[in-house]
Amino acid sequence: ESDVDIAQAEYFKYFAKKLTHTDRVILCSPKPTWVEAGDTRLNSKERHEAYLGIQYLEKLVTNQGAQVTVMLSGDLHHYAHYHSLSSATHKITAGGGGAFLLGTHELPNELLIDDARQTTPFDLTQVNPPKAVSRKLRWHNLLFSWHNPAFAVFLAMLYAFYAWIWQSSSEFTTKTCSFNASGCTQTLMENWAALEFTPSNFINILFEFWSILAHQPITLGLTLLPIIGLIFFATGTHNASLSKQTVWGALHGCGHITLAMVLLWIIAKINIGWMYHPHANFDSAGIPLQKWLHSWQQIGLFAFQSFFFGFFAGGLLFGLYLIVSNAVARMHTDEVFSALHNPHFKNFLRIHISADQLSVYDLPSN
């Protein structure tokens, strides 16, 4: 978006020739590339390439003796003003009219802009929202399911699907019962219903869960899909290395698989350990456990529980991942705020030009 093609370059060259040393110019750019160009946390190649387009236009102006007073852009959905005591140029991002708020807490407090002659420091003089407010807003992602109900429904469907796949696969696996001395004849839910919620039993269900995957290649492949998908989701960020992105994506995917497994354990405890009990009506009526597991009552309850738990727990985990990965690794800068759909902190600029002065006002719309 910030690249200058040949036709545009010729256009700007034509009008730049009309400038004199008394002229002052407001240079508008589709993207505030000075933020990326001056961020010392990025590598030098990224910084150099980011600034090429706007730097070319700036030189067209300065080579005529004119001065770029303001560089103005939108794109990033917040307000940020950079200024340097050694330069007369103000660099302003005014994207407060965007669809959703973008946080300001990752903006560098100082930009170091390199050109052929020198390195110029630009200090961050004003942002909206303030950085402290921006950091606090991230925590609203703990209510991810509330802010993104459609996506939370998608997560719930995945959780229900995998709970069904794993339980069904265990019925066709010969090694599903690590705890049954008489032979491996029980399903995951039957085994897990007998286990209390303790750390040692969690290790046990991990081994049993792996035994299902190890003997069901299709189930293993399906289980790996969310992990692979979330690795690709993580690699869409720009502020971390590919290896770091891969690790975070894999951890996120494994977190959802582990959570879905724990939810299946909880469902097993409820539906078998508590509802199907030696003194429960189902058992006293002579209904075998396998028949109860395949009854419409249990299947309906199983589907509802998987969907219900997946909606809230899956959304909570996804939101927590966005918060932690952004706070620790500076990842998902866009996603952590786009997930909030925050309509506040809108702003627009009012520019007043007189014979000898340029005034720029940042006006909040709310």
Labelled PLM ranges:
Residues 1-25, 32-70, 76-366:
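Metal-dependent phosphoesterase/phosphodiesterase active-site architecture
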